[in-house]
């Protein structure tokens, strides 16, 4: 089955310049898994006849039934470049054999956390775009994530068979379509990238360089300009000069590639290339890309699909394609597949593009180190990562847990960035909350086994050097989802991954049979391990809550919980949306609270953030870890804060990083520093559980105006100050016109023109509003973009399909938080209903607590 043994893989692992770690990313249903098949069959794991139908990397039963990828799956491939191709590689190399660790990731937005986990352990990405529907929302989201992790993209235009057979495009129209997609992708890259002066250099994609592939995953054929340039160089060389050396040949091919794209034209009469669109005698010349590349492909398609027997035979002979005896009898589409697959095999084109243009760990870790490692840039660990040194200290990042066949145990899946990981090695296992020098979230344990991930199988292996992707056994008890594994005593953590979506939809679950409760709790623990994104929370009322990114994500999680993790029947509530609390103006009075012993007083006010600041904090533009003066300057310039106040930010909350700020604007208060920690603790508590219905607060700035304290330290301990600070914060929120915020999805709907009216109807019923509608150039499809409250999104897909006759395809991405119009104190308004429902669900007292509970009189 597999053409190479573990020992051969192990030998290549040491040649770190010849390793490529890459993931396949794209919009949902643009053909990632199908394309991955061509690569896998080239490296000898599926029989080539079945490629395109197997979807080898969809390992789960529900993935095969639904025809979608849910989890990202890793697989190692081995590929040898010919001597001629080696000359195209611009980085260091070591022999001709390459080890490609490929991760096929899901495209569905609900699983974009899986994509993040896949991107963290790879250095390059194959971005797949359907050339009929073009660049979609999810393409942009995953590409943006890739660029943020400093991952080099190459592009693949998939589904060319559709463009030729369904849309029947002319060569020039097809060229324009490709040109437009390349431009769109480059716009995204230049928007989020660091430019040519950045550490990665220029990462724009360009067909001339060979970083764009064209083809069809389903039919199993693909090419880059390099393949055609080679054919023509060979053809022209046969006419004239003798044999070329490999290096000269590579140079020739690279020159040829420049002529095959863009505004270059070919004169078939003279066989010369020209830069003007008309020949000297005034004839209109064809574009080289159309004449020399698309034309032969169109001819093959035309001859075979219109059953022109003689022409087909001629073409097959001319292109020098050897068909098997069984292939010779085929006709129509099966013959087309066989011919195209022999002439332009997808595996070769893509694997060459990957090995030539994607960086090896040696190249990539130089510029990715500063993003990956939290510690100082010059300690042993950082140096080991930068130089990808197998003799350095072990540094390994675990990006996710993979369930094993044995119930309840997990493989830890991740990548070795420095050093060597081996069976039985004693290591430090550090969770995300570990800080150097402290004991919490740190375990010293041996690794039981190291294994190779091979799609549906695992292979044991003795040890794995840096630059490779590996699974570990026996680490799963000590980590929840992600973590760092190291042998270096003073190592800091590898940075935690940033997810592009947040878990905003929740359901409560309980066991149908109360005796099964322990199994449910155990199952929830395993579920939290197996999915990078999901959150499992126990409410104070004893309810078990699961929070996910959307309906589909939750559905899959609950199915996993029931069938794999807890193995018991489960009851679930209707999905509930999490809200945020905020304020809409400044507090109308200065709020005073006294401590329980009446010796200390705090005075505070609350006010809303200027627009955009909360989003900046979410993105990390403004954060607690920034340098003080730099942060103050940013706030003063962009949001017109007073510089003196901006320098006296005490903290962010909840959890020290959230979108609320506590600033100290007191003047000359005694003992202030002694109670700072207590006030901060009260602030974290208050922002985590707001005054209205104990939801997180968002976008509130609290100012401490004045503090009067008892002179004796024993009377101003934490027990006196923390609850007082919390009461005072609540009072200042309640006097500042509190409001609720709800999460909003950005919905992108693709549909034919005639059903656009039906879409507007559904969106209006669901409180959605359309903000952009455009036609996809060159196709009859419309794209409608709208904002839709998450609360209204349940059953939205089904509703939309029934109103449009199943012709509209929605894609929902969490976009932003928006204030729910209405006053929560007015009993008839929507927010007051939400508050009442939430309080009831959480088992709190009915009604928003009165202001008198928090506000004291002098």
From Swiss-Prot:
One of its GO terms (cellular component) is nucleus. Keywords: Acetylation, Cytoplasm, Elongation factor, GTP-binding, Hydrolase, Isopeptide bond, Methylation, Nucleotide-binding, Nucleus, Phosphoprotein, Protein biosynthesis, Ubl conjugation. Its main location: cytoplasm. One of its GO terms (molecular function) is translation elongation factor activity. SUPFAM superfamilies: EF-G C-terminal domain-like (SSF54980), P-loop containing nucleoside triphosphate hydrolases (SSF52540), Ribosomal protein S5 domain 2-like (SSF54211), Translation proteins (SSF50447). The modification Phosphothreonine is found at residues 54, 57, 59, 435. This is Elongation factor 2. It comes from Callithrix jacchus. The gene is EEF2.
């Amino acid at each position: 089955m597999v053409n190479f043994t573990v020992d051969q893989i192990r030998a290549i692992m040491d040649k770190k310049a010849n390793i490529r770690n890459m993931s396949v990313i794209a919009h949902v249903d643009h053909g990632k898994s199908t394309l991955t098949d061509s690569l896998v069959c080239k490296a000898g794991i599926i029989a080539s006849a079945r490629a395109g139908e197997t979807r080898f990397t969809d390992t789960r039963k529900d993935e095969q039934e639904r025809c979608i990828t849910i989890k990202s799956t890793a697989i190692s491939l081995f590929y040898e470049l010919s001597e001629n191709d080696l000359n195209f590689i611009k980085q260091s190399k070591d022999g001709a054999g390459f080890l490609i660790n490929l991760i096929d990731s899901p495209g569905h937005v609900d699983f974009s956390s899986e994509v993040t986990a896949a991107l963290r352990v790879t250095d390059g990405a194959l971005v797949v775009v359907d050339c009929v529907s073009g660049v979609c929302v999810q393409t942009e989201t995953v590409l943006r994530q890739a660029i943020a992790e400093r991952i080099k993209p190459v592009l693949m235009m998939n589904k060319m068979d559709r463009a030729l057979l369904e849309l029947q495009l002319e060569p020039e129209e097809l060229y324009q379509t490709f040109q437009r997609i390349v431009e769109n992708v480059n716009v995204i890259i230049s928007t989020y990238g660091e430019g040519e002066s950045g550490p990665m250099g220029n990462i724009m994609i360009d067909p001339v360089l060979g970083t764009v592939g064209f083809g069809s995953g389903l039919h199993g054929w693909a090419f880059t300009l390099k393949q055609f340039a080679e054919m023509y160089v060979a053809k022209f060389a046969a006419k004239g000069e003798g044999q070329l050396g490999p290096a000269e040949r590579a140079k020739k091919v690279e020159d040829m590639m420049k002529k095959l794209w863009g505004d270059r034209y070919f004169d078939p009469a003279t066989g010369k290339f020209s830069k003007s669109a008309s020949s000297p005698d005034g004839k209109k010349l064809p574009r080289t890309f159309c004449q020399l590349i698309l034309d032969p492909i169109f001819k093959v398609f035309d001859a075979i699909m219109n059953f022109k027997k003689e022409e087909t035979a001629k073409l097959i002979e001319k292109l020098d394609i050897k068909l098997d005896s069984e292939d010779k009898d085929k006709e129509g589409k099966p013959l087309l597949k066989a011919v195209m697959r022999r002439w332009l095999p997808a595996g070769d084109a893509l694997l060459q593009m990957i090995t030539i243009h994607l960086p090896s760990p040696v190249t990539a870790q130089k510029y990715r180190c500063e993003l990956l490692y939290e510690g100082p840039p010059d300690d042993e660990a950082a140096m080991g990562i930068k130089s990808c040194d197998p003799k350095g200290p072990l540094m390994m990042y675990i990006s996710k847990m993979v369930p094993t066949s044995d119930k309840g145990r997990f493989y830890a899946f991740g990548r070795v960035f420095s050093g060597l990981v081996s069976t039985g090695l004693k290591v430090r296992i550090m969770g995300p909350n570990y800080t150097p020098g402290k004991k919490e979230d740190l375990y010293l344990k041996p690794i039981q086994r190291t294994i190779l991930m091979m799609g549906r199988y695992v292979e044991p292996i003795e040890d794995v050097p840096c630059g490779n992707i590996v699974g570990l056994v026996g680490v799963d008890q000590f980590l929840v989802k992600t973590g760092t594994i190291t042998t270096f005593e003073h190592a800091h953590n590898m940075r935690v991954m940033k997810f592009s979506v947040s878990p905003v939809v929740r359901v409560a679950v309980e066991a149908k049979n109360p005796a099964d409760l322990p199994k449910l709790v155990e199952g929830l623990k395993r579920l939290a391990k197996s999915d990078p994104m999901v959150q499992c929370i126990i409410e104070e009322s004893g309810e078990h809550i699961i929070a996910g990114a959307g309906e589909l994500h939750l559905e899959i999680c609950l199915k996993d919980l029931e069938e794999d993790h807890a193995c018991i029947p489960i009851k679930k509530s209707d999905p509930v949306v999490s809200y945020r609390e905020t304020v809409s103006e400044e507090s109308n009075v200065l709020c005073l609270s006294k401590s329980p012993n009446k010796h200390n007083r705090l005075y505070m006010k609350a006010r809303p953030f200027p627009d955009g600041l909360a989003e900046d904090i979410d993105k990390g533009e403004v954060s607690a870890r920034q340098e003080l003066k730099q942060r103050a300057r940013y706030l003063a310039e962009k949001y017109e804060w007073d510089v003196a106040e901006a320098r006296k930010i005490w903290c962010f909350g909840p959890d020290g990083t959230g979108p609320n700020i506590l600033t100290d604007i007191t003047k000359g208060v005694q003992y202030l520093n002694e109670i700072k920690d207590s006030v901060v603790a009260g602030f974290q508590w208050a922002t985590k559980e707001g005054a209205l219905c104990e939801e997180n607060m968002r976008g509130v700035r609290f100012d401490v105006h004045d503090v009067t304290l008892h002179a004796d330290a024993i009377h101003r301990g934490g027990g006196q100050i923390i609850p007082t600070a919390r009461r005072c914060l609540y009072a200042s929120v309640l006097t500042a016109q509190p409001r609720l915020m709800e999460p909003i999805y950005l919905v992108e709907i693709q549909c034919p023109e005639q059903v656009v009216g039906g879409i507007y109807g559904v969106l209006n019923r669901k409180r959605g509003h359309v903000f952009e509608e455009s036609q996809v150039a060159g196709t009859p499809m419309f794209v409608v973009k709208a904002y839709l409250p998450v609360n209204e999104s349940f059953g939205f897909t089904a509703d939309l399909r029934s109103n449009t006759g199943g012709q509209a395809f929605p894609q929902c991405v969490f976009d932003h938080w928006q204030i729910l119009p209405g006053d929560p104190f007015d009993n008839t308004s929507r927010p007051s209903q939400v508050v009442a429902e939430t309080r009831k669900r959480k088992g709190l007292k009915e009604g928003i607590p009165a202001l008198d509970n928090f506000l004291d009189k002098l």
